[in-house]
Amino acid sequence: MIVVKIVIFGLMALLVSVGMLTPSYAHTTVEVEQYKIEAGWGIEPPVVGIRNDVVFKITESGETEGTYRGITSAFQNLEATVMYGGASKNLDINSDPKPGYYFSSIIPTKTGSYLVDLQGEIRGVIVDIQIPVEDVESTS
């Protein structure tokens, strides 16, 4: 009888712990004055040689506490560059239909750590930041 109770308790604990698993998104959010800028990969984990997107979400506080409003035309005077080691590539930024969301297609060619460098301004606020994004993994 005790063995049955232990097995049932173990199964219940396993089910509860599996239910608590959530996907982890390795997006990084930084604040620049009133703006929140989030950067990461569209498909995670990023894998070398597989087409992906560098994605951005740029918001400011909404009218109600705890809400945020997407910033349109944020890249009008803002440039994004992806950097790996000593190499860099300017990104062609596309607007997503959802306000405040942007993306740039890229095929990562090397495993390891990448940075996104943002330079310019958003509505008069100077932006000069580097945001680390999730490491690119190998195909094996």
List PLM regions with ranges.
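N-terminal soluble domains immediately following signal/targeting peptides that reside
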Residues: 23-140
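C-terminal segment of classical bacterial N-terminal signal peptides
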Residues: 16-23
